[in-house]
């Protein structure tokens, strides 16, 4: 190991105040002037000298080319970057040219211990005008304005449940059976009425074709939060659980014991006719058709609910060994089909009620018939449509991180909006599994494309099959079927003039389609000359955060294309963040940062992503990013679209709420749900 990069690593764990300040350079890139080539070059010279100043030199205080190259290779390895020998040699020559241009020789004595703060624009510290600070509203108003569509739907649902419960409660409060069972009876029957209602509407949020069709209506889409369909499905499921506990629990612990132990005189005078004038025992009622169907429904729903829980579906490895064997996405998917049996049992259960003599009182079928017909119609439509789509694979490519890119023919009549997704099936892996993937092609493209990252059993099998076929140069690639398109949150970007698109890892896929669509709009005749796209979009900010350098290969060609087509119009701004690199200002990344800035200034290509989009280090400082947007777009409405893990999603949603309270700019948050 040379003395140069030995000293580099020995000094890499010491910090100065000035160096840490430079970490703010990438935190608010949206306000950086694009014409900063001279500043970059000057700052990169300082960064190179700071990084190399920690290296020992020979007696003449010279750095050799070998020393610099080894320092570059070590710094690259320290930051988990892939760097070839040829690239290291190129960057070494770049440094030598820069030093020779700056001083005429490679002596570094007397070099200023500066930082990269030359790049920091003064507008970062520009305060928000006082008149806008005075426009802050109360937290309640801001919350209501951001969530009013969710609020009214939830309120209407709660009102409907409460009204049905109260109506049935009061009805059975007047029955003769009340004398035997007391308030247990109306409580159980009130809960049963809410169960009928919730068992009906729980199907509607998963009728994806119907939702996609309704999204086309601006008036309907403006008042119904279709993006929250899965959340509402879960909310109604929670209502079903509460209803089961009240209905089943009250029957088993209160109603049935009171019937079995009722005074024979009171029993004969009140409800004997409902039981064939025979007072049943506890077990006789439990083992009756009504009892067994009810218990069977509870058991099946319990299995489905447990296998649909987040630990079971997303992280089965954290579960006990016995449960782990049956957990995962497949268990969730197949167990949900138990509800076919549940609905059959529900109808049977409702036809053998003890205390309901008239057919008019057996109303369960009235609640569920329309939702069940819609759902079954959707399933039939999906089967027919997927069989009619003749989509052939034109090209398949594998990327680092076990990502598979598929480019397919576009079926006739297949129309979609950017941000939508499709379900994909690979019959050679499973004839029954369909998985959702965002389209990464634009609506105007003559093909369809998707990117599949291996995150589960199905995707691993699909990746391995294609990887093996490509390795053997086999022209007979595995076949896939598609179903869709389906609406998603990202397609609502067209509602805004300014959008902020945030993707983590493979979560960038829906926004790649959006960016390509915007670039296509910029090319269309009718695109205005005042930096607007054809659909009225004025500005799109795209933030992509990933852990591995190889991830940039997934969309490298697309980002180059989008950057070139956007050109000088400046409608699209893209920012890549690589979290494996130490933050800017850290000595461990200073040499890489300096080379990156110098290479970008000379060639316009980022050395990390190999695209015209500069890569920033570590993670974005989201509060600074949002504050920068608020200052730049005072009084405007910004659509924030996010696809990635829930933890950051909650953080960004809270940040939007906070910014809406503290600034005059309104941030509207949208998150992808599959």
Name every feature range the model reports, one short phrase each.
Residues 74-75, 91-163:
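EF-hand and EF-hand-like Ca2+-sensor regions
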Residues 341, 432, 450, 455-459, ...:
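Reductase modules of NAD(P)H-dependent flavoproteins
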Residues 394-477, 547:
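Ferredoxin-reductase
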Residues 132-384:
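Membrane-embedded alpha-helical bundles of multi-pass integral membrane proteins
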Residues 2-50, 54, 114-127, 156-160:
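Cytosolic, low-complexity regulatory segments enriched in Ser/Pro/Gly with interspersed Lys/Arg
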Residues 63-83, 107-113:
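Amphipathic regulatory helices of Ca2+-sensor modules
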Residues 230-254, 504-543, 660-662:
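Classical protein tyrosine phosphatase
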Residues 47-62, 85-110:
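Primarily EF-hand calcium-binding motifs
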